[in-house]
């Protein structure tokens, strides 16, 4: 009996030492938006923090359940993002079956692991017909799972806000036909930087919408935070679905001071943030070296400086 009691105490101690990501869906459940804030099932503010995979067609080797499990267990991610490449070689337009298979592998694993997951239409141009078909199929499959978040348009580049808005409303209607509740992320022009313009003419009469803001800290500094502050003051809810510490090219030196300013700003405003990317390209923003295992279990020597810093930030901020 004494041994049984000792084992029970040890088990309880181990459970209390688990990272918060272990219980994230159980804790937060169905998310919703109220004003500028993302709230959980208990109407409490929630900040999701995690990693974006790289384009599925360029770095497919990481799109597997083991990598998702490792990002949750070791990096303490509460959300992961699956960017489905659309236009480049090997993308959705070339091979839709493989594209969907890769995205579903990540989504299914995130559901299994009890964390949130973003289905990202990773495109720079409006492709209404293809996007409508894709999001209809995803909403049919996953509309009952509170884990799932839909990202309609990764980074509109030269499209105007009226064009992006019209496209987004069409896709929102498509998703809402099958999924009335889950969070939808709406892009804005100029690589998700013109959130202040979107705030002046937001999408009305739909619930649970957030607008994406992307930053790369060595390029995007206080001027972009000023635009974001303007958007928030106008009532626009934001979500940082892609970010990192180097230049907007994805390369160049990391500006750690400016990166930390962004993280502190996001935390102060209770805005979720995701870092780019789980990939091994020869550039600063890819957090892994080619030596990294395809299924997680990465050693410190497998991580670039951006990976070491991101892992540290995620483990620190997702600790509680």
Where are these regions (language model features)?
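Short, histidine-centered active-site or binding-site loop motifs used for metal coordination
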Residues: 52, 86-88, 121-123, 154-156, ...
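Acidic/histidine-rich helix-loop elements
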Residues: 42, 46-68, 84-97, 248-251, ...
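N-terminal carbohydrate-binding accessory modules
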Residues: 21-79
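Aromatic-lined substrate-binding rim segments of carbohydrate-active enzymes
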Residues: 64-137, 176-178, 258-269
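Hydrophobic alpha-helical segments, especially transmembrane helices
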Residues: 3-4, 17, 50, 82, ...
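Generic cytosolic/nucleocytoplasmic N-terminal low-complexity/intrinsically disordered segments
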Residues: 1-2, 42, 101, 308
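Extracellular glycoside hydrolase catalytic/binding regions
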Residues: 28-31, 55, 60, 78, ...
């Amino acid at each position: 009996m004494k041994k049984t009691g000792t084992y029970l105490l040890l088990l309880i101690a181990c459970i209390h030492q688990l990272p918060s990501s272990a219980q994230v869906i159980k804790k937060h459940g169905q998310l919703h938006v109220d004003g500028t804030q993302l709230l959980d099932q208990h109407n409490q503010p929630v900040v999701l923090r995690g990693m974006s995979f790289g384009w599925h067609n360029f770095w497919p080797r990481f799109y597997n359940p083991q990598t998702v499990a490792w990002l949750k267990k070791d990096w303490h991610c509460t959300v992961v993002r699956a960017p489905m490449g659309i236009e480049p070689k090997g993308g959705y337009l070339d091979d839709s079956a493989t594209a969907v298979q890769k995205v579903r592998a990540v989504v299914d694993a995130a559901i299994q692991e009890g964390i949130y997951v973003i289905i990202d239409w990773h495109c720079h141009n409006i492709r209404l017909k293809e996007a409508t078909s894709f999001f209809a199929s995803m909403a049919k499959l996953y509309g009952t799972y509170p884990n799932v978040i839909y990202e309609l348009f990764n980074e509109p580049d030269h499209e105007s806000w009226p064009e992006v808005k019209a496209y987004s409303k069409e896709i929102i209607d498509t998703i809402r036909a099958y999924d009335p509740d889950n969070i939808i992320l709406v892009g804005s022009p100029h690589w998700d930087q013109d959130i202040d313009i979107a705030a002046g003419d937001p999408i009305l009469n739909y619930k649970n919408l957030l607008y994406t803001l992307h930053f790369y800290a060595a390029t995007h500094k206080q001027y972009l935070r000023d635009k974001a502050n303007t958007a928030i003051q106008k009532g626009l809810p934001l979500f940082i679905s892609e970010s990192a510490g180097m230049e907007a090219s994805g390369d160049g030196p990391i500006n750690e001071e400016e990166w930390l300013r962004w993280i502190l700003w996001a935390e102060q405003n209770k805005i979720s943030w995701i870092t780019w990317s789980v990939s091994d390209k020869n550039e600063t923003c890819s957090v892994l070296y080619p030596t990294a295992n395809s299924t997680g279990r990465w050693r410190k020597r497998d991580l670039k400086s951006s990976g070491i810093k991101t892992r540290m930030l995620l483990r620190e901020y997702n600790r509680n």
